[in-house]
Amino acid sequence: MKIRLHTLLAVLTAAPLLLAAAGCGSKPPSGSPETGAGAGTVATTPASSPVTLAETGSTLLYPLFNLWGPAFHERYPNVTITAQGTGSGAGIAQAAAGTVNIGASDAYLSEGDMAAHKGLMNIALAISAQQVNYNLPGVSEHLKLNGKVLAAMYQGTIKTWDDPQIAALNPGVNLPGTAVVPLHRSDGSGDTFLFTQYLSKQDPEGWGKSPGFGTTVDFPAVPGALGENGNGGMVTGCAETPGCVAYIGISFLDQASQRGLGEAQLGNSSGNFLLPDAQSIQAAAAGFASKTPANQAISMIDGPAPDGYPIINYEYAIVNNRQKDAATAQTLQAFLHWAITDGNKASFLDQVHFQPLPPAVVKLSDALIATISS
């Protein structure tokens, strides 16, 4: 399987941070987390002095940080959390450069990434998923698609929606002869990381060999294909482009539905087709809690659960375990602990269609949070 290694921006003054998957499916990376001078009990309350925590990165996580930030500030008025949706690649780059406290990411750092940048950690915050949407006026059914067919659509070998390969998955559906217009992210994106892992796993001899997967890949040059910035850009671009197919983070499910986009049932490794609802996401995630390593770098794509949705993931805070001062370190610990406990309640997660971390994974996240120091 070809893995694209993505060098992150000139903002990094040290060795380049490589955004590559270290494993796929049930063979995750393993290893121990970096520990710092602050290893021990997690701070559950922030410092009493005014502290601002800066977050940037994943547009999939951005709506959740927009819920978490004000709620934490209401509880602790001396703490301000700023959030920006810039894409996972930018979030990781800025966390590595030390320009933000939290780099939000749908993609995990591999062992190689963490070895190159001592102190950077993956801290799982919640469980998310990715949907595949399309713009086909007159088609009301949830079309069935799988990774091999989607790979052919993104490679340009399936050119129209009435192609026999799509029709074979959707008997009885009146498919139009509309041209397929693949949409992909133009920014470094954890959503691209997830989607291209799915294509690579289900089409290992095709997409898996080239272009492979990563936060940025060389998408095939397909006539009419479009690049869009962020999940919001993907929703808007697809809504304005009949025939489009697009991969979009589940926190934008409501926006996609409001714009009239269709939502696909995706095929998993058992040959079952599912929508990304709470039941199918939780079923897929259940088998990974005991397999999650201490450094939390694990692919959850297309796992073995027959009733599991195939594109799920942990959403991560990419954090350096050394912060600029004790007040920032304490406050960052307190906020991240709150995020995986109180912040994992349905009152927050249901608004973005996320699922809570299993208790075993909360313990792993807390162990990493406890290492944050100054």
Curated annotation (Swiss-Prot):
What span is annotated as the signal peptide, if there is one? 1-23
State the name under which the record lists this protein.
Phosphate-binding protein PstS 1
Q: Which GO terms describe its molecular function?
A: phosphate ion binding
**Per the record, which residues fall in region Disordered?**
25-48
The GO cellular component terms are: ATP-binding cassette (ABC) transporter complex; cell surface; cytosol; extracellular region; peptidoglycan-based cell wall; plasma membrane
Q: State the UniProt keywords alphabetically.
A: Cell adhesion, Cell membrane, Cell wall, Glycoprotein, Lipoprotein, Membrane, Palmitate, Phosphate transport, Secreted, Signal, Transport, Virulence
PROSITE patterns (UniProt xref): PROKAR_LIPOPROTEIN
Subcellular location, principal? membrane
* UniProt-annotated binding residues for phosphate: 58-60, 88, 106, 185-191
Q: What induces it?
A: Transcription slightly induced by phosphate starvation, part of the pstB3-pstS2-pstC1-pstA2 operon. Strongly induced by phosphate starvation (at protein level). Also shown to be only slightly induced by phosphate starvation; results may depend on growth media (at protein level).
Its domain of life reads Bacteria
Highest classification ranks of the organism: Bacteria, Bacillati, Actinomycetota, Actinomycetes, Mycobacteriales
One Pfam family per UniProt = PBP_like_2
In the UniProt record for this chain, what is stated about the effect of gene disruption? Answer: No growth phenotype in phosphate-rich medium (3.6 mM Pi), decreased phosphate uptake in phosphate-depleted medium. Grows faster than wild-type in restricted (Sauton) phosphate-free medium, even after nutrient starvation. Decreased growth in infected BALB/c and C57BL/6 mice for up to 5 months after infection.
Q: How does it assemble?
A: The ABC transporter complex is composed of two ATP-binding proteins (PstB), two transmembrane proteins (PstC and PstA) and a solute-binding protein (PstS).
Q: Answer yes or no on keyword Secreted.
A: yes
